[in-house]
Regions:
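Alpha-helical protein-protein interaction scaffolds
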Residues: 1-13
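Intrinsic-disorder/low-complexity signal
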Residues: 13-162
Length: 162
């Protein structure tokens, strides 16, 4: 689904530049969103989890994939470099707090702790799209097999205004 979102986001600028695309028309859809957050990481044997705290206090994560406000998170990637994605098409105003849970962050790696790249995107696949990048190392994570707020920390915030 993440790749389909990225491919659909290219349709408008390609058409605006006079180009053509070869994406099957059945796969072209409305994928623009008010808020989109994507993470990817540098260690293929790490399990990094994306958690989003929505303005109403609801947490969207692998065990709560769809929120009452309409936000949804992609499948939990337990192997490889990710990515994991959160998207909400019509986002209520307020802060969307990003938490990273380094469930198995591979700190034994001789190259040091892994890094996570966080893409905070407003108005994804729209002419007014804006993006902020956050690069974070995972050295703040201690232990493994954690699944509660005390063992994570907020690492970024995407604000939606109306």
């Amino acid at each position: 689904m993440i790749a389909l979102m990225e491919a659909n986001a290219l349709v408008v600028p390609i058409k605006a530049a006079g180009g053509r695309w070869t994406l099957d028309k059945r796969l072209v859809g409305l994928t623009d969103t008010d808020a989109r957050i994507v993470i990817e990481w540098t260690a293929d044997d790490a399990d990094i989890d994306l958690w989003i705290d929505e303005p109403n206090g609801e947490r969207v994560m692998y065990s709560n994939k769809r929120s009452s406000a309409g936000g949804q998170i992609s499948n939990d990637m337990t192997d490889g470099y990710g990515p994991e994605e959160y998207a909400i098409r019509r986002a209520p105003a307020g802060p969307y707090r990003v938490r990273i849970n380094g469930y198995d962050a591979d700190r034994i790696n001789p190259n040091g702790p892994g890094h996570v790249l966080i893409r905070l995107q407003r108005n994804f696949a729209r002419a007014s799209e804006a993006q902020e990048l956050v690069d974070l190392d995972l050295s703040f994570q201690n232990g493994r097999d954690r699944d509660n707020e005390d063992d994570t920390k907020p690492v970024a915030t995407l604000r939606v205004g109306r």
